[in-house]
């Protein structure tokens, strides 16, 4: 890509197309849901976010139920996931009362929507993750919040890894990607739930890419005190009991409501849909042997 007769690196082009203050895709429209260009896992069914919340509680307990900790979500979209997480954690009062909920959001438009959707909750929006309070830290990154390969993405990951080294905790990364050592060309644009030309309608289409999780794993290996585990959507969510949770919920549903719920669950775990394509990665300290959600080989 060239601008003003000079080459523009791909990561800078994506940053401009998505986050330019005036023309960026995420700066001027809501991309989520039927009226947007794509649907994310938390918007398919709230059960997904409930499962993530239960995982957070389990991880928190494995670390000795610390009295203060930060739960940070990178790019909260319309705020639906962290909203459900907060609602679920209220069933675990000790965990809820000791948690500082935080969001790191680049888009001013989405930040406004999040603040409206979450106005009754105790949430802090942060600009610089280096300025997070010096407490135990949990971070959640989902769907396209870390670039496929760019200096910026690894700078984010480096900052989080340093926080984990210093304060303990971990980061849960959920995204579509692959584990091959060989790099894949996966860049694509999406508009109205359909593929589009990446160089057309810049600022009007979402740009997506599959994460190379092998690169993330190698990057993590540079930190002697840290380790990582990788699974996929199907194995992680199944191990965490998403089907059993859906069965409990469905007991009080009509036949059509029950059918719709299990259709949505299948969408998350079916290998031909999100079950295999989406990966789940946990980065934590080596001394922490926690593997909940990652037991299935």
Residue ranges and their predicted role:
Residues 1-74, 78-130, 241-244, 249, ...:
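Rossmann-like AdoMet
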């Amino acid at each position: 890509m060239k601008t003003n007769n000079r080459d523009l690196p791909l990561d800078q082009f994506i940053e401009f197309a998505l986050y330019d203050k005036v023309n960026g895709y995420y700066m001027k429209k809501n991309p989520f849901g039927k009226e947007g260009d794509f649907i994310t896992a938390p918007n398919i069914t709230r059960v997904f976010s409930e499962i993530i919340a239960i995982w957070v509680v389990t991880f928190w307990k494995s670390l000795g139920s610390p009295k203060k900790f930060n739960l940070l979500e990178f790019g909260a979209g319309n705020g639906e996931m962290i909203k459900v997480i907060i609602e679920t954690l209220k069933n675990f009062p000790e965990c809820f009362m000791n948690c500082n909920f935080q969001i790191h959001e680049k888009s001013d438009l989405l930040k406004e929507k999040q603040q409206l959707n979450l106005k009754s909750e105790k949430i802090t929006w942060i600009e610089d993750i280096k300025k997070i309070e010096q407490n135990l830290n949990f971070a959640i990154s989902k769907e396209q919040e870390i670039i496929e390969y760019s200096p910026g993405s690894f700078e984010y990951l480096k900052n989080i890894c340093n926080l984990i080294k210093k304060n303990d905790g971990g980061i849960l990364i959920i995204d579509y990607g692959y584990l091959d050592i060989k790099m894949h060309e996966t860049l694509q644009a999406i508009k109205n739930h359909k593929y589009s030309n990446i160089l057309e309608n810049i600022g009007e289409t979402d740009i997506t890419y599959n994460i190379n999780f092998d690169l993330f794993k190698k990057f993590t290996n540079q930190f002697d005190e840290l380790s990582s585990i990788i699974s996929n959507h199907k194995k992680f969510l199944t191990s965490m009991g998403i089907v059993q949770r859906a069965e409990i919920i469905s007991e009080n549903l009509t036949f059509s409501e029950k059918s719709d719920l299990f259709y949505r669950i299948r969408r998350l775990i079916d290998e031909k849909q999100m079950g295999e394509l989406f990966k789940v990665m946990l980065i934590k300290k080596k001394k922490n042997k926690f593997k909940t959600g990652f037991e299935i080989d």
